[in-house]
Regions:
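C-terminal core of ALDH-fold dehydrogenases
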Residues: 304, 312-423
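Conserved small-residue-rich beta-alpha loop and adjacent elements
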Residues: 99-164
Length: 423
């Protein structure tokens, strides 16, 4: 039986009509006016009107010199892990060709998109990991032109660490611009910036809405909502660590969602007490406490099977398993963005360092999609060719199949081949 010790507060669905209209106006102005429209919104929202929005070679060369050696080493380490895992993913996306019947050859080719745009948020804080995840991954996939943009810091250009991360990740063009106007510039193109084929990266609700409205003009990765974590824990789990991981996600956003699925009331109650204790001294408690109060859930279940059901219903962005037998959950849980198995891993590792991508589905989207990977930046295309003898045999069946659907011109395209290749 499933029992709630703590439930999230039910909130009315937010009316985003005003957000949609604001985004629509920004997109239209930049589509129609180009750089003039971009400059208008950059001045309005970011107090930023540089001679050129593209970051200069001098700025790029200077970025590394502004950072402590340890920070550079750490960035390089994190990027190496992300690159290594992406390369392993890429090895498993392969071309192939097969002869399905004598004389009929079918094949698959993996072709990278020509150009992608990476949006790295961070006007308030440097979001280094977002640069790692959204720049390195397309480069490993073989994208020849990767455009990266990030908002200015209080009218002073990019964070040096963010800029270095973009450069080290392999970005081909870097622009200092943020928000909806940055996405519009990448999608439609402006003077000196050719449009991209797809865009990836997270942001606020305006950025998410812009991606939704631009989908079709460009491809997108996914529409991200507030971050989520669901932790499955049994009595072997350490309440101190479980609580720390809950708060690690809660500090993201007052709307962040957290759930503990406990296999006993004991671990549930101990963890709740530990969350309250850790919140007292947490530097980010102003955000984390609100997220936990409003959106935190604690659910006690009787069995691993019930835990799997709750988890799959949630379809969390991040799934942590802190149980004696985490392999059971790896084998049976189906809906999640990324799984962190055992006490020895934590969401923070995946967010920043360990190598898996942190751009993950939220809002139950894990029911039908995974997170960002090299696979998002390639097209799986197919081809076919046949001998004359095989074409003759296929044409006879295909002509009838077309006629069953009253697609008569289709049928004729088969018949002319049947007639031509008749023995």
């Amino acid at each position: 039986m499933i029992k709630y010790l703590k439930k999230a507060i039910e909130k009315p669905q937010e009316d985003i009509t005003a957000v949609q209209e604001t985004v629509r106006e920004i997109l239209a102005k930049i589509k129609n006016e180009g750089e003039a429209g971009l400059r208008f919104y950059s001045e309005k929202f970011d107090n930023w009107s540089p001679k050129s929005f593209r970051v200069s070679e001098d700025e790029i060369r200077a970025a590394k010199s502004k950072l402590p050696a340890t920070e550079v080493e750490d960035i390089d380490f994190c990027q190496a892990q992300i690159r290594n895992f992406a390369q392993e993913q890429m090895k498993r996306l392969v071309d192939f060709e097969v002869e399905t019947v004598p004389g009929v050859h079918l094949g698959q080719k993996i072709i990278p998109v020509s150009c992608s745009g990476s949006y790295i948020p961070g006007g308030r804080y440097p979001m280094l990991a977002s640069a790692h995840m959204t720049v390195i991954t397309p480069k490993v996939a073989g994208v020849s032109r990767v455009v990266a943009c990030s908002p200015p810091v209080k009218g002073q250009g990019l964070w040096p660490a963010t800029l270095y991360s973009m450069v080290a990740g392999g970005a081909d063009e870097i622009y200092c611009m943020g928000g909806v106007h940055a996405l519009a510039a990448m999608a439609y193109g402006i003077e000196g910036l050719q449009p991209v084929d797809m865009m990836v990266g997270a942001g606020n609700k305006y950025v998410a809405e812009a991606k939704r409205q631009l989908f079709g003009t460009v491809g997108i990765d996914l529409l991200a909502g507030p971050t989520e974590i669901l932790i499955i824990a049994d009595d072997t789990a350490d309440p101190f660590i479980v609580a720390a991981d809950i708060l690690g996600q809660a500090e993201h956003d007052p709307n962040a969602r957290q759930a503990l699925v406990a296999l006993s009331a004991s671990i549930a109650e101990k963890t709740m007490k530990e969350v309250d204790r850790q919140l007292v001294d947490l530097p980010t408690k102003d955000i984390a406490a609100v997220a936990w109060r409003d959106n935190g859930e604690v659910i006690v279940v009787d069995s691993p099977e019930e835990a799997v059901k709750v988890s799959d219903d949630w379809a969390p962005e991040h799934l942590e398993v802190q149980t004696e037998d985490w392999k059971y959950y790896l084998d049976n849980c189906k809906n999640y963005g990324s799984a962190f198995l055992g006490e020895e891993t934590t969401v923070a590792y995946g967010d920043k360092t360990i190598g898996t991508n942190h751009v993950l589905p939220t809002m139950k989207a894990a029911r039908y999609t995974g997170g960002l990977s090299v696979g998002k930046f390639v097209k799986t295309v197919t081809y076919q060719y046949a001998t004359k003898e095989a074409s003759y045999k296929i044409a006879d069946v295909c002509e009838r199949a077309c006629n069953y659907e009253n697609m008569l011109a289709h049928g004729i395209s088969c018949k002319v081949r049947k007639d031509k290749y008749a023995k």
